[in-house]
Amino acid sequence: MQLRWTQRGMMWLGALLTLLLCSSLKGQENSFTINSIHMQILPHSTVQNGENLTLQCLVDVSTTSRVKPLHQVLFYKDDVLLHNVSSRRNTESYLIPHVRVCDSGRYKCNVILNNKEKTTPEYEVWVKGVSDPRVTLDKKEVIEGGVVVVNCSVPEEKAPVHFTIEKFELNIRGAKKKREKTSQNQNFVTLEFTVEEQDRTIRFQCQAKIFSGSNVESSRPIQSDLVTVRESFSNPKFHIIPEGKVMEGDDLQVKCTVQVTHQAQSFPEIIIQKDREIVAHNSLSSEAVYSVMATTEHNGNYTCKVEASRISKVSSVVVNVTELFSKPKLESSATHLDQGEDLNLLCSIPGAPPANFTIQKGGMTVSQTQNFTKRVSEWDSGLYTCVAGVGRVFKRSNTVQITVCEMLSKPSIFHDSRSEVIKGQTIEVSCQSVNGTAPIFYQLSNTSKPVANQSVGSNKPAIFRVKPTKDVEYCCSADNCHSHSKMFSEVLRVKVIAPVDEAQLVVLKGEVEPGEPIVFYCSVNEGSFPITYKFYKEKESKPFYQDTINATQIMWHKTTASKEYEGQYYCTASNRANLSKHVIQSNTLTVRVYLPLEKGLIAVVVIGVIIVTLVLGAKCYFLKKAKAKQMPVEMSRPAVPLLNSNNEKTLSDAGTEADRHYGYNEDVGNHAMKPLNENKEPLTLDVEYTEVEVTSPEPHQGLGTKGTETETVYSEIRKADPDFVENRYSRTEGSLDGS
């Protein structure tokens, strides 16, 4: 019993110790670190297509634990996860068997231990070469023109793949046909190749190319099985009948034959050509025939083409036909004849063999002999040929153009204007020869000077458009192929009327007194007679005088003028060349009728206005001058004489200065004012200003009595050079008479 309690106590003690140990271990966590990580590529980073590739990830981890921690190893290609494994080992491997181009790329290894991780650098792997493609054909025997389907694939590679397929003839170097195609989504292509007529035994070759980054990897060229080609028909053959020498007049037969195999589904088309022209063809049998009577025109190269769908075979032969007689020659005594002359035609054959002759004009027979003679008319113009025959052979000669020219009739000349011709107006002058062979050459002349030329291809009139500016005489000449000299028409006289141009009104005297005459002249620069003149007073619709005369000027006068004739006047001029809306109007003139008293008053007013204007101008000038200098000098004395440019006079001179305005000389009363700068003083003269007290007489006193009223006057004194006379200009404030 005691022993049982002892054993039970020991068990509890062991359990207690275990708990204590575990709690102690839990209180102390293990520490770890990833010292390094490295990746190896075996056998090396550049491998041939089909080899095995091993990626090794080497990890060095340090820890305080007696047991190596469990870490996670990840393999990446181009940042895409390839393999993931949890391990306690230092080295983990990943095998890629039979690498292909698609396995080229950048590889790296990543290690994760709890919350710590480390990654290796990226390693470039390059797979060289492409696996051999597979070439398959849909048939091993084919007829000419048939189609062979070629399939080329690289099953172990990934798209896109660029395929090149070539067709070769057995025992012949160089490809007969080459085709290329890129398959974007599949690792194979299927292409059709047509079998041509020259193919006998053919094979196909395929090569694959894949783009890997900046590199292009290519496979070995792989050849297909041999394909046997059967003919659908033979090459064409020619048969010429008669054999040997072929003479003109013989029956010529050109035959082309071909042999068709039993594998052909239908007959091919047989075509016979002579110098590109198809002369015979057949698609219902194995031959085509061209039959004709032989002439020298059938000499040449003949070609036979046999065509069926995609197949075409060609054969050629040269046919020589011996000439029986030469081509006839047609000769004429002349090719251009005047009407009434004799035409002589002669047809001959070199060597002069016996033959039958026919002379034709435009397809109609005019003679059945070698010679043809006739006195010609215009209707005999045309094309002449000669036909010579020996047996069944007929030959046509050269063509001769005969032109018979009819003499022209005297041309007539006329124009279309039914009324008078106005200067500058366009008129149509026509010239026509009713009889004569065309073309006819017309020339329009003006007093022996050519104006225009025109050729007409018929007997219709030639129309010339002219613009005469004065009376003119026209004549036209006509000429054609006839040997006669030119024919001249009569003279056509064209009368041209000129419209009135620029009217002008002139008055003999624009200002008249009552009882004096008023005389108007209305004239024009140019215009055909008669001219109608009309005189108008302004604002009146009807003329007060009009007349039609044969002159470029007209006068109207009124012997005694009165006040009612005062106003504005104008005139108009027109002739039959002026349209109603284009009447020429002159300038406008004003006529004034004055009484003698009015005339004197007007003169006085005009003179007064001139004097006032000059006084105001001088006053403004001196005021501006005084303000500009601003150098007033004051002085006073009883009376100072005023000086002008010519004389010195006192302001108190009776009868001479009392009624005179200042700033003018004595000649003002004679309507002549002397300019202030008469002595042409230089602009640099010194100027002095003096204040002067002037005594003026009382208004009610006479000019000889001295008044007691004084005025202040500013005097400007200029100092001149010794060579000049001293000029003094005086101005007073107000007038001398107190007004």
UniProtKB/Swiss-Prot annotation:
GO terms for biological process: cell surface receptor signaling pathway; cell-cell adhesion via plasma-membrane adhesion molecules; cellular response to mechanical stimulus; immune response; positive regulation of MAPK cascade. The chain crosses the membrane at residues 600-618. Residues 35-120, 145-213, 236-315, 328-403, 424-493, 499-590 form the Ig-like C2-type domain. Residues 722-739 are annotated as: May play a role in cytoprotective signaling. InterPro entries: Ig-like_dom (IPR007110), Ig-like_dom_sf (IPR036179), Ig-like_fold (IPR013783), Ig_Fc_receptor (IPR050488), Ig_sub (IPR003599), IL-40-like_Ig (IPR040878). Changing Y689F: Strongly reduced phosphorylation by FER. Abolishes phosphorylation by FER. The modification Phosphoserine is found at S730, S735. Glycans are attached at N52, N84, N151, N301, N320, N356, N371, N435, N446, N453, N550, N578. Residues 619-739 are cytoplasmic. The Ig-like C2-type domains 2 and 3 contribute to formation of the complex with BDKRB2 and in regulation of its activity. Cell adhesion molecule which is required for leukocyte transendothelial migration (TEM) under most inflammatory conditions. Tyr-689 plays a critical role in TEM and is required for efficient trafficking of PECAM1 to and from the lateral border recycling compartment (LBRC) and is also essential for the LBRC membrane to be targeted around migrating leukocytes. Trans-homophilic interaction may play a role in endothelial cell-cell adhesion via cell junctions. Heterophilic interaction with CD177 plays a role in transendothelial migration of neutrophils. This is Platelet endothelial cell adhesion molecule. The gene is PECAM1.
